[in-house]
């Protein structure tokens, strides 16, 4: 008689570089189940502190275990030199999450290589990465943009979480340590929001094939999380998820949506229906919405909603990226007109992305307030508000960056 086989989806979460390894440490700490953790780093000392199931110290000859020095080229070379080892630990995976903090050397340079290997082995490959805080310096911001663009080419789906947006949902007294912990928590939510749909038996159950149908070759994805208690809690949590400050754009036009609703045993059918309806109205009319509901008595009277939207026309929602700061307000109104007014109302958050230009060259800093408070005649000038994206490519001013030996 044939031995019984394990038909569970094999999910592996790979933390690449310092930020990625910190993120999987957080996932292990909170007890994320049903996945295997792999830590990959050029910093041998940081690897020693990880609780991952598998640890790969790559670039031993290249860096002697001392890190990549915030140089993505070093991180990339280290990964290529150990390609066979990485292939070995990824074999047999149905789904691979590549998580990293973009902007440094190891995560930025190595994540695309790891993703390329995972995808070549036939695994559904999802990147979940953070964009660095503004205070981490221009060099990291520029390296992060290059790394994100490169990673997008190697994964099925890419979720980018801008760390600066965490400040908009944090207390002004938040410490730097807590800010980075918040970033780890959001990376956890991104991975958990997907894996729980597959690994946790639910009231309305989903499987790996459901998730794959939405996320395979989906391009950029947006993730929103929300929780609420009291009256209309499910709708409030869903509203919070689709208008989350973490979203870089609106989910309008998403052709694939993963929706997970978790609540206690008192979670009502009509509550679920109302929350799901709210999300479906925000997505494309013909969107493939994969929906799951999990009963977790540990939540008490709290309802949690996780929304992951993908499958945008063109692979990503680029039209909104320049107006991302107004995305929260835009969702409930017309997509084009309110973008300018909401950018005004969220000026404090917007300032985060404009700090470096203001320090280096006062000239761009002057028009910035003018555009925000200006008349509609200045409207057309608003979209080319791309300074944070890539005007610093050739600059060598790195005084804001952290010294390489600390990486």
Curated annotation (Swiss-Prot):
NCBIfam families: ftsZ
UniProt keyword Phosphoprotein, yes or no: no
Protein name: Cell division protein FtsZ
PANTHER family in UniProt: CELL DIVISION PROTEIN FTSZ-RELATED, MITOCHONDRIAL DIVISION PROTEIN FSZA
Keyword Cell cycle: yes
Low complexity bias (residue ranges): 336-348, 368-377
HAMAP family: FtsZ
Quaternary context: Homodimer. Polymerizes to form a dynamic ring structure in a strictly GTP-dependent manner. Interacts directly with several other division proteins.
Keyword terms of this UniProt record: Cell cycle, Cell division, Cytoplasm, GTP-binding, Nucleotide-binding, Septation
Pro residues biased stretches: 381-390
Organism field: Streptomyces griseus
Swiss-Prot/TrEMBL GO biological process terms: division septum assembly; FtsZ-dependent cytokinesis; protein polymerization
Primary localization: cytoplasm
Binding site for GTP: 18-22, 105-107, 136, 140, 184
Molecular function terms, GO-annotated: GTP binding; GTPase activity
Entry similarity comment: Belongs to the FtsZ family.
Region (Disordered): 312-407
Pfam assignment, any one: Tubulin
Skewed-composition ranges (Acidic residues): 396-407
Chain ranges passing through the membrane: none
Localization annotation: Cytoplasm
CDD domains (alphabetical): FtsZ_type1
SUPFAM superfamilies in the record: Tubulin C-terminal domain-like, Tubulin nucleotide-binding domain-like
């Amino acid at each position: 008689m044939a031995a019984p086989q394990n038909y569970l989806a094999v999910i592996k979460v790979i933390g690449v570089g310092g930020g990625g390894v910190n993120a999987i440490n957080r996932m292990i700490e909170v007890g994320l189940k049903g996945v295997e953790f792999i830590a990959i780093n050029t910093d041998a000392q940081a690897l020693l502190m990880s609780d991952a199931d598998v640890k790969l110290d790559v670039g031993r000859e290249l860096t002697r275990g001392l890190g990549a020095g915030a140089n993505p080229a070093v991180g990339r070379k280290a990964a290529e030199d150990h390609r066979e080892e990485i292939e070995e630990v990824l074999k047999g995976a149905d789904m691979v999450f590549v998580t990293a903090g973009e902007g440094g050397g190891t995560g930025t340079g190595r994540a695309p290589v790891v993703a390329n290997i995972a995808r070549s082995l036939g695994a559904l490959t999802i990147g979940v990465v953070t964009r660095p805080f503004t205070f981490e310096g221009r060099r990291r911001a520029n390296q992060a943009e290059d790394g994100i663009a490169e990673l997008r080419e190697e994964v099925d789906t890419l979720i980018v979480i801008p760390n600066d947006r965490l400040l908009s949902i944090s207390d002004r007294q938040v410490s730097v340590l807590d800010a980075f912990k918040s970033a780890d928590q959001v990376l956890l939510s991104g991975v958990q929001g997907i894996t729980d749909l597959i690994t946790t038996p639910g009231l309305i159950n989903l499987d790996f094939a459901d998730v794959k149908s939405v996320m395979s070759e989906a391009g950029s994805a947006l993730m929103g999380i929300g929780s609420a208690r009291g009256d209309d809690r499910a709708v409030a949590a869903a509203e919070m998820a689709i208008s989350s400050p973490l979203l870089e754009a609106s989910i309008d036009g998403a052709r694939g949506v993963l929706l997970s609703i978790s609540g206690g045993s008192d979670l009502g059918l009509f509550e679920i229906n109302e929350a799901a309806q709210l999300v479906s109205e925000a997505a494309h009319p013909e969107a493939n919405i994969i929906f799951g509901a999990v009963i977790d008595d540990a939540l008490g009277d709290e309802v949690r909603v996780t929304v992951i939207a993908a499958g945008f026309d063109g692979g990503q929602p680029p039209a909104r990226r320049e107006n991302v700061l107004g995305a929260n307000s835009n969702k409930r109104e017309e997509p084009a007109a309110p973008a300018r007014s909401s950018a005004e109302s969220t000026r404090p958050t917007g300032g985060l992305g404009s700090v470096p230009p203001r320090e280096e060259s006062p000239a761009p800093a002057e028009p910035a307030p003018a555009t925000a408070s200006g008349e509609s005649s200045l409207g057309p000038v608003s979209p080319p508000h791309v300074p944070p994206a890539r005007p610093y490519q050739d600059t060598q001013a790195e005084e804001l960056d952290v010294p390489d030996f600390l990486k």
